[in-house]
Structure formats: C-alpha cells, structure tokens
Amino acid sequence: MPATQTLCYNCFRQVADPSAPCPHCGFDLAENRQKFPVALRAGTVLNDRYIVGRVLGQGGFGITYVAFDTQLQARVAIKEYMPSDMATRVEGTTVSVMMDTRAEDFTYGAERFQEEARTLAKFIGHPNIAGVSSYFDQNDTSYFVMDYIEGVSFKSYIANNGGKVSVDETLNVMIPVLRALTAVHAEGFIHRDVTPDNIYISKDGNVKLLDFGSARYSIGDKSKS
C-alpha cells in the first residue's frame, strides 16, 4: 500500500506536499476539506483496501468519494451512507445518529442503501450504468464501491455550452439514459432521481446514469405512511 501521507488525493500520484495544490492535477486538498467538513479525512483507509480521496459530491443521504483501490491499483468511487439531517461524524470516522428518535429512520435508510448496492451490482458491465463492484459495513455505516467516471455531468455540459444544447446532442445523451432505465426497470428497480446532475459524460463520450438515490425517497415514503 502506498504511503498515504505523500499522495495527491485526487490523482493519487506521489507528491512532496499533499497540503499544497497538486503539481500533476492541480487538486487543492484544503479547499475540498473546507467545502465538505463532515466527510471522511482524505487518506482514511476503508476495508483494508481503499484509500479515501477527495469528495466528489454530497447529498442529503450520502457522500461520494474518489478512492484508490490498492489491490487493483486503480481509482474507484465510494459512496458512504451519511444522512446529514440525522447523523454526525464522531472521532473523524464513525457515523452516529444524532437523536434516538431518528434511529429507526437511520436503519430504514441504511437498508434501502444496501438494496441500491445489491441492485446496481447486477449491472456490472452495462455501458450506461455505473455498476457496484463491492459493498461493506464500517464506521457504523455502509459503503459501496462503483466505477470511477472521469468526465462532466450533463448539467455542467449544458452550462459550458451557454445553457443550451442541440436536439441531436440531447438525443445522444438521453437515448443511452433510456437504455439504462429500461435495464433497471426490467429488474423492478426505480431510479426516481433522473436529473442532469446524475447523468455523466465520460472523457471518451460514453454516457452513464449515476446515483439511484433509493434511500432518500424510501425514507420520505416511510415517513408519510
């Protein structure tokens, strides 16, 4: 396993000073930490295998990190179950429910998170779905490991093109998304959060559907029942 204290936590190349912007990719660790204060510290090792890197994004019910798989020597994405309205971080790693009255909701959400992982594991190799390759529990919460996609969200792509795209460009993105949804629906699973933020265009032009968000909506459904 590489020495984590000398790594850039984005590209995972060796650097002289990880606290300074990376000379290879420009990543600024201090800026990322400031933006996501409840996230795991970069350099944390999960499941004796994955070195946690920068935060890719944080939603109401989870945090997604880029990580380095020390067995495969490759970057992956790891999603952590961390519902921000009912849990907090203790001692830098452990996830703890803030109030006993929310313990049932936390557990219910964790079950839906696990269901999402099991479902996505069925789609390893699908060209338009970021499949799950591994799942594990640690720090009193749950994690799953996904393909790391280097590219831009459809939302960013639209913004970078002046806020609009042509019909042909839209079809080139949405037809693969519909293929992904067809495959997922055939397994009885519903995405329920298809937004430009959750559609990614990789550097080679491939379109991937991300973040099935089952925990978020299932908890909402439970609270209304």
Give short role names for the model-derived ranges.
Residues 53-59, 64:
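Protein kinase glycine-rich loop
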Residues 90-122:
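AlphaC helix of the eukaryotic protein kinase fold
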Residues 135:
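Activation-segment/catalytic-loop signature of the eukaryotic protein kinase fold
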Residues 139-153:
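Conserved short submotifs of the Hanks-type protein kinase catalytic core
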Residues 154-165:
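AlphaC helix of the protein kinase catalytic domain
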Residues 173-174:
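Activation segment signature within eukaryotic-like protein kinase domains
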Residues 178-189:
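Protein kinase catalytic-loop region centered on the HRD/HxD motif
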